[in-house]
Amino acid sequence: RVNLYNGDNAAALADAQAVITGSPYKLYTIEDYTKVWIQEFTSESILEFKITTTNNAQRNSVGYYCDSEGYGECAFVEDAPLYTYLVANPDDIRSKLIKDQTSGSESGYYPAKYPGREGNMYVNNPKIIRLSDVYLIAAEAAVKTGGDAASYINTLRKNRITGYEDVTSVTLEDILFERRVELFAENSMAFDYWRNKMSVNNPYVGEVKYNDYRTILPIPLDELNLGDALVQNPGY
């Protein structure tokens, strides 16, 4: 992923291929997909944070943001391309990860990727890097270097879509949309677009271009107060 941000697509592709062919990680199957979100250290999980009932972010937990009984700030936008695709494609197992909370206090449809272990919405292990992301990294690097990007997308989709038929080619836009479908609610989409020098449009803050200072978060005040060596990021 770092190589993609650095524009070293050949290295990104080589590294991704090494993980795909030489690691013990396996893509989730269609049968497994809806079950893995309440499990720890699953077959795709290359890096994830360990969260427990005693060590968690409480009301700053991702599960609290993705539930109508929490902050309710991560509902799907119902007329946006992602939600429209999921609703229109029931053969895609990823469409089953929509929580209908239209009767909740913060009414809407929410991602079901953070159900909370033992009934506690605070307790979810965020999956930082998983194998499907690596396939998508390989596809993005391949399409930028003239390689066979479609093969990576086909392999991923066969493990997501019942009755899927291979395509012979994909574009960068196809790959970025596949990232939205596969990695929604996993802190990916905005950075994917900025990495490719595209803007993100948010109804609350407007257009955020790839070179906007807000694409890099501020250093927390507590960290700045530790000493004089740290300098706040520009714009804050």
What are these regions (language model features)?
Residues R1-Y64, E69-A75, V87-Y236:
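Acidic/polar-rich alpha-helix caps and helix-coil junctions
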Residues A80-V87:
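Long, low-complexity, acidic/serine-threonine-proline-glutamine-glycine-rich intrinsically disordered tracts
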